């Protein structure tokens, strides 16, 4: 017998994920909420330069938004691709007007009137109208915790792709 365990995933959250104007992008409802924020001449801060963050930034630039991308690594797509390929993505975002803040993280996001103030780990801060969290996903494995299956950021598998621990 064969059983496929497709756990799914949810957007990784931060302490400020519930601040109005801060968005995640994982579901159609998330996309619909974010779409209302995509307005020309407004400023979007994108936290994370992986696939979700890079695509959201590109879309925001297309509609005429000012975009700042914040990424703790030295280049976008750093967890999925090498620095050279990430550099190509960075160049394209720069060509289209994005401000890139690499090698720095966000310490805090707080409302300031109708805008959001982002405090960064390098001591700088700036304001944006909306924020997108593109900082990865969390695998939905909680329901497997008492199953005996070995978990480590997902289901641990052996060389034959069989779950370890059962």
Regions found by a protein language model. Name each.
Residues 20-41, 125-166:
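FAD-site-proximal beta/loop scaffold in flavoenzymes
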Residues 43, 51-108:
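Rossmann-like dinucleotide-binding cores of NAD(P)H-dependent redox enzymes
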Residues 28, 103-107, 121-123:
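Conserved SAM/SAH-binding loop
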Residues 1-3, 110-125:
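Conserved beta-strand-loop-beta-strand element in the redox core of flavoprotein oxidoreductases
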Residues 10-12, 53, 76, 126, ...:
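Glycine-rich nucleotide phosphate-binding loop and flanking beta-alpha elements
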Residues 2, 99, 130:
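Short, Asp-centered acidic motifs that coordinate Mg2+ and/or phosphate
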Residues 95, 120, 158:
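Short, acidic, Ser/Thr-enriched surface-loop or helix-capping motifs
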Residues 5-63:
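Glycine-rich dinucleotide-binding loop and its adjacent helix/turn
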């Amino acid at each position: 017998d064969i059983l496929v365990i497709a756990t799914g995933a949810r957007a990784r959250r931060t302490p400020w994920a519930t601040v109005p104007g801060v968005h995640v992008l994982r579901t159609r409802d998330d996309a619909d909420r974010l779409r209302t924020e995509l307005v020309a001449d407004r400023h979007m801060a994108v936290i994370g330069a992986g696939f979700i963050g890079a695509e959201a930034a590109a879309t925001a630039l297309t509609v005429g938004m000012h975009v700042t991308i914040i990424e703790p690594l030295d280049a976008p797509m750093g967890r999925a691709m090498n620095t050279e390929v990430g550099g190509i993505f960075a160049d394209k975002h720069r060509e289209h007007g994005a401000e890139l803040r690499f090698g720095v993280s966000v310490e805090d996001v707080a409302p300031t009137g109708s805008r959001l103030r982002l405090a960064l780990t390098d001591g700088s801060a700036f304001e944006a109208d909306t924020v997108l969290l593109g900082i990865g996903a969390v695998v939905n494995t909680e329901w497997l915790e008492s199953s005996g299956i070995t978990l480590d950021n997902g289901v641990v598998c052996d060389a034959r792709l069989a779950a370890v621990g059962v």
